[in-house]
């Protein structure tokens, strides 16, 4: 197979924990051809969507985060010329990201197979998407109005505020009704009422970990990655200093995953990361879900292998 990965700059990838690297490594073991692009390598030219792609060879063994690959010369290739195009660009989900999804959707119409679906990515903001599944979510509020946030705080006394377009725990604040800088935090996050944010009731179960549950082709991986906050921190994100511990799915984890899995897969979302704190769904990650390496290293489950298995099966069905 000929696979194209749309990624952040390769030198920014930490191969010891990066899920895109895990998938590329698994694909290389199976002798699939690898190509990489960045977001700005996509173009509409001569009535088709093309990519300025570089052939990628993975070094075996890798020699660290900055010496694990070799790239060939740039090739101009229609996206329909790949067996699959995997969109793995990290947020922020800004206007450039949106434009990329439009180009990728055009490529789909020309026969390209894009994972995850560009429309699916665009339609599922990673914070807002949980509002479709209220029976699994904590009390939540989406607004730019300070008064509504203050009323929500008065009701729940201890809440989390987060931007709708962040990642890795960036811009997340916990506030309690006894704090003295509440107004400043709200003004900063909402940019004086001009930016919509999400508020959620604080879940003390975060101390036991913010669980990342991976869905592959609608089915949950048997282990979640519980991201445990460092002392004094309320964010479990690994980027915020959390520690990842693989754990078997609980009955509630599986209930959430199995209900959402087939719904999201039917929308073209083949690889999804659900974030669950305690018994509550807090986010649905569809851009570039992570956690494969940590789960695989700790449990022996080849998560990237499950993903490439599913990808091969879907490509075979598409080509029949």
Swiss-Prot record:
HAMAP family: GSH_S
Residues in ATP-grasp domain copies: 127-312
Reaction(s) catalysed by this chain's protein: gamma-L-glutamyl-L-cysteine + glycine + ATP = glutathione + ADP + phosphate + H(+)
Originating species: Nitrosomonas europaea (strain ATCC 19718 / CIP 103999 / KCTC 2705 / NBRC 14298)
Family affiliation: Belongs to the prokaryotic GSH synthase family.
UniProt keyword list: ATP-binding, Glutathione biosynthesis, Ligase, Magnesium, Manganese, Metal-binding, Nucleotide-binding
Pfam families xref list: GSH-S_ATP (PF02955), GSH-S_N (PF02951)
Phylogenetic classification of the source organism: Bacteria, Pseudomonadati, Pseudomonadota, Betaproteobacteria, Nitrosomonadales
Gene designation per UniProt: gshB
Protein's recorded name: Glutathione synthetase
Residue positions binding Mg(2+): 283, 285
GO molecular function: ATP binding; glutathione synthase activity; metal ion binding
